Amino acid sequence: SRTLIKSKLWVGPEIQKEMKLVAPNLDLTVDYGWLWFLSQPLFKLLTIINSIINNWGFSIILITFIMKIITYPLTKSQYVSMSKIRALQPKIKEIKEAFSDNKQRISQEMIILYKKEKINPLGGFLPVFIQMPVFLSLYYMLIGSVELRHAPFVLWIKDLSSQDPFYVLPIIMGLTMFFIQKTSSNNISDPIQKKIMNFMPVIFTVFFLWFPSGLVLYYIVSNLVTIIQQKFIFSNFKSN
C-alpha cells in the first residue's frame, strides 16, 4: 500500500519575513544560539528600525544606542563602584605597606575599609555579567541574520555580513577599546594585570579583522557610547 504525504519544504536563504509566509513559526528555525529568546525580539526591533531608515548599518547604530541607554543604570553602577575604589587607592596602599608581611591581615583590613566606605568590591563586575547576555544576544543576532548579507552601509562597506576589505573598522574598534581599557586600568594596582589589560585591544583588533563589518560597527558604536558614559560618570563622581 502507498500513503501520500504532503508537506512544504523551504529551500533558500533564511529570510524570516518570507519564511513566515510559508508556515507559522518557521522563522523561529533561524539559529540564534542559546540566547534566541533575546535575539528574536532584538531582530524584530532591528527590522522595524530598518523599515523606517532603510539602511541596515544605521539600524545597527540606532539599536546599539537603544541598548546602551537601557543598560545605562548598570553601567553607571559599574563605573561609580570603580570610581570609589580608585578614590580609596591611597588608603589601600597604606594598608598594604603597613601589613606587607601579613596577607591575611591585609585582606581583613581591606574588608573593614570596604564596609566602612559602603563599597562592594564586586560591584564593578556584577553589572558586566548582567549586561553580558544582552550583548551576546546582539552578537548572535547580527551573525545569524541573513538579511545583512550584501547589505551596504556607507563608502567602502558594501556588505555588512563580510569583513572590512581595508580593515579600517577593526582598527577604529581597537582604538576605542584601548581608550576604554586605559581609563579602566587606572583602578588596577597589579602592574602585570595592567599590562595584560592594555594589551587586550591589540588581541581583539586582530580577531576582529575577519569579523563581519556589521558586528564590528556595533562594537565601535558601543565603545564610543561607553567612552562618553565613562567621562560623564567619572566627572560627576569627582564633582560630588
From Swiss-Prot:
The chain crosses the membrane at residues 46-66, 123-143, 160-180, 201-221. This is Membrane protein insertase YidC. Belongs to the OXA1/ALB3/YidC family. Type 1 subfamily. Its main location: membrane. It comes from Buchnera aphidicola subsp. Myzus persicae. One of its GO terms (cellular component) is plasma membrane. It is a multi-pass membrane protein. Keywords: Cell membrane, Chaperone, Membrane, Protein transport, Transmembrane, Transmembrane helix, Transport. GO terms for molecular function: membrane insertase activity. GO terms for biological process: protein insertion into membrane; protein transport.
